[in-house]
Design a protein with these regions (language model features):
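Short SAM/SAH-binding signature in class I
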Residues: 134-140
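Residues immediately flanking
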Residues: 126, 141, 178
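Aromatic/histidine-rich interaction motifs
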Residues: 7, 11
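Conserved S-adenosyl-L-methionine
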Residues: 12-130, 145-146, 150-152
Length: 216
């Protein structure tokens, strides 16, 4: 999509991240968190969806140099996409990762994607994670080649389950290739969906909680 110049090991595909944002019902006023943000793809794609930023809006295409395609058509369509951006959207995205290099990458990628003012990324351990009120958590916990150690992946899923159940948000959507994720997480998902991250077969585990409301 033109914004991810650098990425961490085994990043999630941008198109898959956008699909997860759709499944997570991200809206213009959503608050999205990711405790394992890596290079920031899930949070960035959620921000672009909330703001109605067209994919590839900030990149250039080889077809723009084709003689038989009038230049004004490209300019017209690009301006149309810009006019449809929801500048008044109240979206906020927050990502966390234990790796400072990944956090620096995520912040740089958000700026390249045009959502640097709507997203922020911080260095933090998953044990410190707290879901904010009415937040939607979209995450891709480390597994397989991202981690290399199945026992460590299980430990991270267990920790995520503990902090989630202590501070549940509006919804949690976790994509992983770990077939025993629910067992490690400590709770059966409300829904599951089979999905692929590139050639890696995964499951998207979906957990729902009722949004907190102010008392009248």
């Amino acid at each position: 999509r033109g914004y991810r110049k650098n990425a961490t090991l085994a990043p999630i595909k941008e198109t898959l991240a956008a699909a997860i944002a759709d499944l997570g019902r991200v809206r213009r006023d959503s608050l999205v968190q990711d405790p394992f943000c890596g290079s920031g793809t899930l949070v960035i794609e959620a921000a672009q969806k909330a703001l109605n930023l067209a994919p590839g809006l900030r990149r250039r295409f080889a077809a723009e140099h084709f003689d038989f395609v009038p230049a004004d058509i490209w300019a017209e369509q690009r301006q149309k996409a810009l006019d449809e951006v929801r500048k008044d959207a109240a979206f906020e995205g927050i990502g966390y990762d234990i790796d400072p290099a990944a956090v620096a990458l995520a912040n740089a990628n958000a700026k390249l994607a045009g959502v640097g003012d709507r997203c922020r990324f911080e260095v933090a351990d998953v044990r410190e994670f707290r879901a904010l009120d009415n937040a939607t958590v979209l995450t891709n916990p480390p597994y397989g080649e991202r981690l290399g150690d199945a026992s460590e992946a299980a430990s991270l899923a267990r920790t995520l389950g503990q902090v989630w159940q202590a501070h549940p948000a509006q919804g949690l959507y976790a994509i992983t290739a770990d077939a025993e994720f629910e067992q490690h997480f400590g709770k059966k998902a409300a829904r599951r969906r089979k999905i692929y991250n590139g050639m890696i077969p995964c499951q998207l585990y979906m957990y729902f909680e009722q949004p907190k409301r102010e008392r009248k």
